[in-house]
Amino acid sequence: MTYENNTHQQNGAGTADIESRFANMSVQNGAAGGAPRKAYVPPHLRSQQQPASLNSSAASFSPRAPAAFNGNGNSNGNGNGPAAPAAPAAFQSFNRGAPRGGAGGWDAPSSGGYGGARNGGGYGGGARNDGFGQWKDGKHVPGPHNPRLQKELFGEEGDGLHQSMGINFDKYGDIPVEATGRDVPEPVTTFTSPPIDAHLLENIKLARYTNPTPVQKYSIPIIKLGRDLMGCAQTGSGKTGGFLFPILSALFTHGPPPPSAAEMAQGGYNRRKAYPSTLILAPTRELVSQIHDEARKFTYRSWVKPAVVYGGADIVTQLRQIERGCDLLSATPGRLVDLMERGRISLSNVRFLVLDEADRMLDMGFEPQIRRIVEGEDMPGVMDRQTLMFSATFPRDIQLLAKDFLKEYVFLSVGRVGSTSENITQKIEYVEDDDKRSVLLDVLASMPSGGLTLIFVETKRMADMLSDFLLRSKIGATSIHGDRTQRERERALELFRSGKTPIMVATAVAARGLDIPNVTHVVNYDLPSDVDDYVHRIGRTGRAGNVGHATAFFNRGNKNIVRDLIELLKEANQEVPQWLEAVARESMFGAGGGSRGGRGRGRGRGGASSFGNRDARTMNGPSSGGGRGFGGGYGGGMGGGLGGSYGAGAAAYGGPPPASNGGSYGGNSSWW
């Protein structure tokens, strides 16, 4: 025991002696004229130091006075200083401070940061040139130009990676447009300010968009007036810009909306929960990523911070992104529900709800999640938000959904809904399954070089097999399907977009919504069972007025869509092979007269019995005919019910309401 005690005492003395020596060490020891330095304190002894000894060195980390709240970054560099007593009055949708590692703050330190009421301090970008601006003193203050980011977002003229205007773009002026509803405003004809915010107009010019498409000509004034909208337009017609332009114009002009009650209850400073003011739902990872990329372009140098969340990717990375700012959120329904359950996103401050490719979301089984998001959480009701639904088709189930989600909307039909663009030259080849590979090689060899070719197949296994076959044939190809990891999918898309791999084999996962520039040829190696899917597949080419080619391999295994396919070809003024009409006559014997084959979700085309391209509210009488689609019996019950009162909720967003209304479209002059 004595030996052990002596040992402990010796060890204690030795430790103290070593610590004393460390404390007296200095890099200046022995140097002539060296200034005295503070003694080194080992980490385990630093807590024993008196706080007073740190006062002088901690001055730069002291919290600012309340009047200069958030003017300085905290120790993490997240741009948020200590909370001030007046925090609830200084609404913060989410952490809109500088990105991690920045100097922090809402403004330069001399201006007091984000202090006082909403029209006081800054609201938006950080101290470094991160491509964001601010909302300060009730005004939108664009950030400085960032050449590197600008090149990343908008590319350079002639780089081939950013398609904006095709050679047939002016023909869009001849496309018929039908807008039904009460007090539909006149369309715009050019990109001008007003109605488009001046800063957004600069970004549109950077994107080299010169003329609005038909859907944009109508959607911009409709959305500006605070109206709900159902927009039907052919693929590649500019639907994304059709809702982004008016939404961003309103946000740039009016600034962030006031905090919701839920936000105020938490003091407005809950950094762990995002409160987006705009929510865009889309069915696939690729589509929400594409929408987010467009949003990044048009929010460049603005106070609005876009974010994107989707399944199949690292959720921690996405959480970090929304922590840096989440004013405009693009999301897939499944991942959004996940983040809401985690308490990381609240929809209580949503003023704009956009459902893009709405019919495909329902086809993919997302209706329960969509209804939970819109009706089962804290999103404002239909009268207190503006809801926009965009898609290439609006079958019956979507029109029924509109009854619950939209208020006295404008129905916008641009061109023949569900039809294909005349810019696409369609060719149907009769090919037996065993001959498809050899015929594909002939088709690819006959096409001019320089463009991208997208080949659609029905199964994931076939996508990989066909891609391998092309590679063995010395043809550069890649594949994309649902079993690929998100990293693999993004890599394949990157190679395809850049032209390094000019051919991509895809399943339906890439069939909808993807806007890949310079796709000049689409091949339906396997025809889908529904003609709507065919429409969306070939819609990957001929976008924005450009000319495209579509080739389909047909055999008698595809008889279920032959009649709709013929009708589609005739609508687009395409050649109909005689053998295809012969197959159609064969299929008439023994075929039922009610619904289309395949999934049986037939939309019907033309005539009073179909309304995929018709406003259901105009169909008050019984439908004529009982043929394809679902014309029989639907019109009478739907006619008067989709409307409803429009006066109890939100007001006209971006200007005075139409004079014929006798007032605004809502109970208040604006959301602000």
Swiss-Prot record:
The keyword Hydrolase is annotated on this UniProt entry: yes
Residues spanned by motif Q motif: 189-217
Keyword ATP-binding: yes
Motif placement: DEAD box: 356-359
Superkingdom assignment: Eukaryota
Intracellular or extracellular location(s): Cytoplasm
Biased composition (Low complexity): 56-73
InterPro entries, per the entry: DEAD/DEAH_box_helicase_dom (IPR011545), Ded1/Dbp1_DEADc (IPR044763), Helicase_ATP-bd (IPR014001), Helicase_C-like (IPR001650), P-loop_NTPase (IPR027417), RNA-helicase_DEAD-box_CS (IPR000629), RNA_helicase_DEAD_Q_motif (IPR014014)
Ranges of biased composition (kind: Polar residues): 46-55
Helicase ATP-binding domain: residues covered: 220-412
Family: Belongs to the DEAD box helicase family. DDX3/DED1 subfamily.
The name this protein goes by in its record: ATP-dependent RNA helicase DED1
Gene source species: Mycosarcoma maydis (Corn smut fungus)
Biological classification of the source: Eukaryota, Fungi, Dikarya, Basidiomycota, Ustilaginomycotina
Gene name for this UniProt entry: DED1
